[in-house]
């Protein structure tokens, strides 16, 4: 910074440097006395602390001007720097201090230093009226002494709190016996006053600990709360218990003193504060005190909590619903009590009516627990299962996940639901989520909602569901909790609706066939393999899929699975096991046999596929399966032999396996599907036989198939009048041997459960031209082999069915308390 350059008087012109580098002559300025020279000196960089801030002594008078010099001023703002020395003085007092005054001020500051420290650290020790000079120039900037005083103030407050705590504890300890006696007084006025005093004491930590350590006091509070009719007494007693419930010792004392029945009784109180105290105290007990759940159930707390769902206080409802979730989780009796009290309807109403995230989250948790209860499912669906679906687009991830779990649990009971196009579209979109749980739930819900519901199938296909599901399977890798429900959904979408053929082609066009064949190999478990086999069977209904499936090696792998499953069933039968239908990963090997043979049946419609099957030397196995005690296995075995017999070479190989006798026996089967296929195989095998043999066979077929009905055989025009679209099975996930109903499965997502249709229907005409395709016997009127889904009964084809043992059946993966 340029400075004034002072020259001795008479030494020539004096000049001042300016920021612009120009100099002006100040020689003509009037001479300055000593005071003015001192003030001028203070304007430049030599200005120092006079001791007011640092406490150091100095001979310079106190500074009364700014610390800014000329270089800090912007001369470009039009300021006249030539008279700057005098402009500085205009804003300040022109009073000058003598050296004596400066010394006096410094001495005063030195003498009051200890007082300033005492005032900062212990202000209560100062006498009233004493004024102590402060060194704080800026109110926003504390001095060093003030900053150092903060820890001492904290220490002082801690000491004071400790003294007060001890005083509170001593007071409470002395007062508790007397207050306990007053709470037991017969005079309700005395009881009310005592309850108020105890409530006040419970607000302080020391006395609160003293109260909770006195079982007699807590018991007296509970008795007073139970017996009084005075609302104020009830409020104070409930408030005291609420304060105690924030400590584990307090919870234990309340529990042992019988406080839970008294608190449950208060849930009927008309006073808001009493209700709040009661529900929050019960909530704390349910969360942290062992034995509280059973005590609340026995006291009738569930019924009263369900009634409280009609209130409109959002935070109160959030606590109440959380209590219901704690009580219902893992306890079937509690779920049934909530159902009987009308809980599902109220919970769905809350989901529809409010937007408070915490309330929606706690309510969705209750619905998730109730949705695994077979009795509650229909009630929730009837009340409006769309309630949870309203929040699938919510920004709260925990709420979205709970809603999805709930919908997945409910979806097997809502397979007949309609007008859910928006939900289906949202689910397809959620398949693209990065959250594994969301994708898992979305796939499971789609699997259930497309079960035996043509409208839902069409909707999912139209909103890009096929592509989304194939992409999900490709991205899921070995995560079977995702691939299995996704495969099952595709299986439903590829049969029995107007868009089925499009869906069958779409799976191929979106490169789904290679990954599906890959899923037939390890490490896939049996539930997933079973679902994939069913999907491949449906895909084989599309002629364009035959060659790709064959090229990707589907046929040899399916035959390997068939042989493995059959050998397993044979080992159990040979071992003489009492239960010949044991489960492996929740799947019966008989189901795998049925499914694989059914898939081969459909794939054998194509000539090249038939050649591959013949080359795998499995016709003898098909012949053995004709002796199976299970009608559905007999039916699919006869069906695949019927297709293989379409070629002369195949017919000869079948006859060489000695199948004539079992096939003739099956003509008399009570299962019309088995008899029909057996007749078709025998007829095709007789093509090269003498005319007499054909005539005898025709008579045998007529007498066996129509059993006395006067239906004449005509010329053998074939089985063209048997509508193959009617002969398709329902969306079988071949869980028909152990499912508890549509959608209920032992592992993996719920699937279509029709016990009759196993893997396949009676489709007798090969898609490719064969030597016998147009010369098969007319079996008379169409036999409607399409059966409605059954709710857990035996095979509608009359096959033997062993009732499911609940101990052997794995819990459905969507039916668990999560």
Curated annotation (Swiss-Prot):
ARM repeats lie at residues 164-203, 248-287, 412-451, 454-495, 501-541, 543-582, 648-687. Residues 1-21, 48-66 have a biased composition (Polar residues). Belongs to the beta-catenin family. Keywords: Cell adhesion, Cytoplasm, Cytoskeleton, Repeat. GO terms for biological process: cell adhesion. PROSITE patterns: ARM_REPEAT (PS50176). It is found in: Cytoplasm; Cytoplasm, Cytoskeleton. This is Catenin beta. Pfam families: Arm. It comes from the Eukaryota. The keyword Nuclease does not apply. The keyword Repeat applies. GO terms for molecular function: cadherin binding. InterPro entries: ARM-like, ARM-type_fold, Armadillo, Beta-catenin. Binds to the cytoplasmic domain of the cell-cell adhesion molecule E-cadherin, and perhaps to other (membrane) proteins. The association of catenins to cadherins produces a complex which is linked to the actin filament network, and which seems to be of primary importance for cadherins cell-adhesion properties. Residues 1-24, 48-71, 732-818 are annotated as: Disordered.
């Amino acid at each position: 910074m340029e400075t004034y350059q002072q020259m001795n008087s008479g030494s020539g012109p004096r000049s001042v440097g300016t920021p612009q580098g120009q100099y002006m002559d100040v020689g003509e300025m009037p001479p300055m006395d000593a005071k003015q020279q001192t003030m001028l000196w203070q304007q430049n960089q030599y200005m120092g602390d006079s001791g007011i801030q640092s406490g150091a002594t100095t001979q310079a008078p106190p500074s009364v001007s700014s610390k800014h010099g000329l270089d800090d001023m912007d001369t470009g703002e039009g300021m006249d720097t030539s008279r700057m020395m005098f402009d500085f003085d205009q804003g300040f007092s022109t009073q000058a201090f003598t050296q004596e005054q400066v010394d006096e001020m410094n001495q005063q500051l030195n003498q009051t230093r200890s007082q300033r420290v005492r005032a900062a650290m212990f202000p209560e020790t100062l006498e009233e009226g004493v004024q102590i000079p402060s060194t704080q120039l800026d109110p926003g900037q504390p001095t060093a002494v003030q900053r150092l005083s903060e820890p001492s103030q904290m220490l002082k407050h801690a000491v004071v709190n400790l003294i007060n705590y001890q005083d509170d504890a001593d007071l409470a300890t002395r007062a508790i016996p007397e207050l306990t006696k007053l709470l037991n007084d017969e005079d309700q006025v005395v009881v009310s006053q005592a309850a108020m005093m105890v409530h006040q004491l419970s607000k302080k930590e020391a006395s609160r600990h003293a109260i909770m350590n006195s079982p007699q006091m807590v018991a007296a509070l509970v008795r007073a709360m139970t017996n009084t009719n005075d609302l104020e007494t009830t409020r104070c007693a409930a408030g005291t218990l609420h304060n105690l419930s924030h400590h584990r010792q307090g919870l234990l004392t309340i529990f042992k003193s019988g406080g839970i029945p008294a608190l449950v009784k208060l849930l009927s109180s008309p006073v808001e504060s009493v209700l709040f105290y009661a529900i929050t105290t019960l909530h704390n007990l349910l969360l942290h005190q062992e034995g509280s759940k059973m005590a609340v159930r026995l006291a009738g707390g569930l019924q009263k909590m369900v009634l409280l769902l009609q209130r409109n206080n959002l935070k109160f409802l959030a606590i109440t619903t959380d209590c219901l979730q704690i009580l219902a989780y893992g306890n079937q009796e509690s779920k049934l009590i909530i159902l009987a009290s009308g809980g599902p309807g109220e919970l769905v109403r809350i989901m529809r009516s409010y937007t408070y995230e915490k309330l929606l989250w706690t309510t969705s948790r209750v619905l998730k627990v109730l949705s695994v209860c077979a009795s509650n499912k229909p009630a929730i669906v009837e009340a409006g299962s769309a309630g949870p679906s309203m929040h699938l687009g919510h920004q709260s991830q925990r709420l979205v996940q709970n809603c999805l779990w709930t919908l997945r649990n409910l979806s097997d009971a809502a397979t007949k639901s309609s007008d859910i196009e928006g939900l289906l579209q949202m689910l397809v979109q959620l398949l693209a989520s990065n959250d594994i749980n969301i994708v898992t739930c979305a796939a499971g819900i789609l699997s259930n909602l497309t079960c035996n519901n043509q409208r839902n199938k069409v909707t999912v296909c139209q909103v890009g569901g096929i592509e989304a599901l194939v992409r999900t399977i490709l991205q899921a890798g070995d995560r079977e909790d995702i691939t299995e429900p996704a495969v099952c959904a595709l299986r439903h979408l590829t049969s029995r609706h107007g868009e089925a053929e499009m869906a069958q082609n779409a799976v191929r066009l979106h490169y789904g066939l290679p990954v599906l064949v890959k899923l037939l190999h390890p490490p896939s478990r049996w539930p997933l393999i079973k679902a994939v086999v069913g999907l491949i069977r449906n895909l084989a209904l599309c002629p364009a899929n035959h060659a790709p499936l064959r090229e990707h090696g589907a046929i040899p792998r399916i035959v390997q699975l068939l042989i493995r499953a059959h050998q397993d069933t044979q080992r159990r039968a040979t071992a003489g096991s009492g239960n010949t239908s044991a489960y492996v990963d929740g799947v019966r090997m008989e189901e795998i046999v049925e499914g694989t043979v059914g898939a081969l049946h459909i794939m054998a419609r194509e000539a090249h596929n038939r050649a591959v099957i013949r080359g795998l030397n499995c016709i003898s196995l098909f012949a053995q399966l004709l002796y199976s005690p299970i009608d559905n296995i007999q039916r699919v075995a006869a069906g695949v032999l019927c297709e293989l017999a379409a070629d002369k070479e195949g017919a000869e190989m079948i006859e060489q396996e000695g199948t004539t006798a079992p096939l003739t026996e099956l003509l008399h089967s009570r299962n019309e599907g088995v008899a029909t296929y057996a007749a078709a195989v025998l007829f095709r095998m007789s093509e090269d036989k003498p005319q007499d043999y054909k005539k005898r066979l025709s008579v045998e077929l007529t007498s066996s198939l129509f059993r006395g009905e006067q239906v004449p055989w005509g010329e053998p025009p074939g089985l063209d009048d048997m509508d193959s679209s009617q002969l398709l099975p329902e969306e079988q996930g071949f869980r028909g041997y152990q499912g508890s109903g549509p959608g209920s499965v032992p592992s993996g997502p719920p699937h279509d459960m029709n016990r009759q249709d196993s893997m396949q229907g009676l489709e007798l005409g090969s898609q490719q031209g064969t030597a016998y395709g147009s010369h098969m016997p007319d079996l008379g009127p169409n036999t409607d082999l399409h059966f409605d889904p059954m709710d857990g009964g035996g095979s509608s084809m009359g096959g033997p069915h062993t009732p499911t043992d609940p101990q052997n059946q794995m819990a459905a993966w969507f039916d668990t308390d999560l």
